[in-house]
Curated annotation (Swiss-Prot):
Main function: Odorant receptor which mediates acceptance or avoidance behavior, depending on its substrates. The odorant receptor repertoire encodes a large collection of odor stimuli that vary widely in identity, intensity, and duration. May form a complex with Orco to form odorant-sensing units, providing sensitive and prolonged odorant signaling and calcium permeability.
Ranges per topology, Cytoplasmic: 1-35, 85-128, 191-251, 296-358
TM stretches of this protein: 36-56, 64-84, 129-149, 170-190, 252-272, 275-295, 359-379
Additional detail: The atypical heteromeric and topological design of the odorant receptors appears to be an insect-specific solution for odor recognition, making the OR/Orco complex an attractive target for the development of highly selective insect repellents to disrupt olfactory-mediated host-seeking behaviors of insect disease vectors. Odor-evoked OR currents are independent of known G-protein-coupled second messenger pathways.
UniProt-recorded Gene Ontology molecular function terms: ionotropic olfactory receptor activity; odorant binding; olfactory receptor activity
Family of this protein: Belongs to the insect chemoreceptor superfamily. Heteromeric odorant receptor channel (TC 1.A.69) family. Or2a subfamily.
Protein's cellular compartments: Cell membrane
Protein name: Odorant receptor 33c
């Protein structure tokens, strides 16, 4: 059998975390601490703030939409990053649970399901995410390169700085460099943010289904009754790990997904409005089209895999009664009956964004409807 290693999918996430918060990994020297503090003050805090402050200066309509598009994206990115930093200890515990659950995959049917569904979906999602991030940052850096070689030192995004950029070319170059650097750091934050939730929900749904396969096969092999009863007790212990897994996931992604749903809906509306009314050059049009796709890629996988988790939890009682429980000992049947009653409560487990919005495909379509409604308001306000 092939060795299962689900944690390999998290390597890019931890690479981002090592770049952004090396102090979490016991690297607590004074220069490293100073690096982390400055990075989060200058980028996580000040970058979205200096974009938002520009909105108070009453810019033109085109500047307002261009600024607001990036402002909302960066505010959401910073908030999600801070939420992930707060939950890093729980994320480490989740990884230890995944590592334990991987060791329980034994039969050919389980390996086949893991290979064809869990591993395939996780790999497809991560590749799609990395390609989309790569495309948008390739276009971003190409646009910066074209701007610099043409001698244009204007800011990438209209923003507030406490000094006059027009009268001092050097300060203008510093401000432009700051925005480019901040966008690259925000890219690492965004990659970490958008990798974790869908990937973890995918693995949770997969391991719940794999447990159902094991449970459904119980009693169909030529084993003694005592052996089957012990296996039932082992599966109950595995179920406890799944319960802990589910609880930790619900807690660690709650705030992140609330920001995701609200931020994506507003950002999609503003991107479409800006493209229709203000984008004139081809590079910007392609950039914002890819940006629109990236925002959708951010939102859809989390909702899709959350729906899969809910469906797998609904099927747990059926998986238990699919086992050959009727040929087992009285103790086996009694334990299974009590256990089934407990799992019926799983059907009420719902992963919610911020404890308010149920996370599933309905939430994804509701967000798109919200974006369309906001866009309709903009169109009506423009008199089109």
């Amino acid at each position: 059998m092939v060795i299962i290693d689900s944690l390999s999918f998290y390597r890019p996430f931890w690479i981002c975390m090592r770049l952004l918060v090396p102090t979490f990994f016991k690297d607590s020297s004074r220069p490293v601490q100073l690096y982390v503090v400055l990075l989060h003050i200058l980028v996580t805090l000040w970058f979205p703030l200096h974009l938002l402050l520009h909105l108070l200066l009453l810019p033109s309509t085109a500047e307002f939409f261009k600024n607001l598009t990036m402002s909302l994206t960066c505010v959401a990115c910073s908030l999600k990053h801070v939420a992930h930093l707060y939950h890093l200890p729980q994320i480490v515990e989740i990884e230890s649970l995944i590592e334990q659950l991987d060791t329980f995959i034994a039969s050919e049917q389980e390996h086949r399901y893991y290979r064809d569904h869990v591993h395939c979906h996780a790999r497809r999602f991560t590749r799609c995410l990395y390609i989309s991030f790569g495309m948008i940052y390739a276009l971003f850096l190409f646009g910066v390169f074209v701007q610099v070689i043409s001698g244009n030192w204007e800011l990438l995004y209209p923003a507030y700085f406490p000094f006059d950029l027009e009268s001092n070319r050097f300060l203008g170059a510093v401000a432009l460099g700051y925005q480019v650097f901040s966008m690259l750091v925000e890219g690492f934050q965004g990659l970490g943010n958008d990798t974790y939730t869908p990937l973890t929900l995918c693995l949770l749904a997969g391991h719940v289904h794999l447990w159902s396969i094991r449970m459904g096969q119980l009693g169909y092999f030529d084993d003694e009754t005592v052996v089957n009863h012990q296996r039932l007790l082992d599966y109950i212990e595995q179920h406890k790990l799944l319960v802990r897994f589910h609880n930790l996931v619900s807690r660690t992604i709650s705030e992140v997904q609330l920001v995701q749903l609200g931020g994506c809906g507003a950002t999609l509306c503003i991107i479409v409005s800006y493209m229709l009314f203000f984008v004139g050059d081809t590079i910007s049009l392609v950039y914002y089209l890819v940006f629109f796709g990236v925002v959708c890629v951010q939102l859809f996988p989390s909702c899709y895999f959350a729906s899969e988790v809910a469906e797998e939890l609904e099927r747990l009682p059926y998986a238990i009664f699919s086992s050959r429980w009727y040929d087992q000992s009285r103790d086996h049947r009694f334990d299974l009956l009590i256990f089934t009653q407990l799992t019926l409560g799983n059907r009420g487990w719902i992963i919610k964004a911020g404890g308010l919005i149920e996370l599933n495909l309905n939430a994804f379509f509701a967000t798109l409807k919200m974006a369309y409604s906001l866009f309709a308001v903009v169109v009506r306000a423009k008199g089109i």
